[in-house]
Amino acid sequence: MNFSRILFFVFTCFVALASVSGAPEPRWKFFKKIERVGQNVRDGLIKAGPAIQVLGAAKALGK
């Protein structure tokens, strides 16, 4: 009897979760913000690349 109740409960939870469609997205998109920060860091390194190379060459000449 208890097993059938547990099975029924699990089945109803599964049906309830499977029938949900189009849940609204959360307003605070944490992973999107992290992704944007990573893109900004990458873009900054790309823009600063030539300056870093010049500094590396100058440091090598100074040795």
UniProtKB/Swiss-Prot annotation:
Gene Ontology cellular component annotations, sorted alphabetically: extracellular region
GO-annotated biological processes: antibacterial humoral response; defense response to Gram-positive bacterium; innate immune response
Claim: Kinase is one of the keywords in the record: no
Xref: InterPro entries: Cecropin (IPR000875)
Compartment annotation: Secreted
Signal peptide (UniProt feature, chain positions): 1-22
Keyword Signal annotated: yes
Disulfide bonds: none
Pfam assignment, any one: Cecropin
UniProt propeptide residues: 23-26
Keywords, comma-separated and alphabetical: Amidation, Antibiotic, Antimicrobial, Immunity, Innate immunity, Secreted, Signal
Leucine amide PTM positions: 61
Role this protein plays: Has antibacterial activity.
Family: Belongs to the cecropin family.
Name this protein carries in UniProt: Hyphancin-3E
Species per Swiss-Prot/TrEMBL record: Hyphantria cunea (Fall webworm moth)
Taxonomic lineage: Eukaryota, Metazoa, Ecdysozoa, Arthropoda, Hexapoda
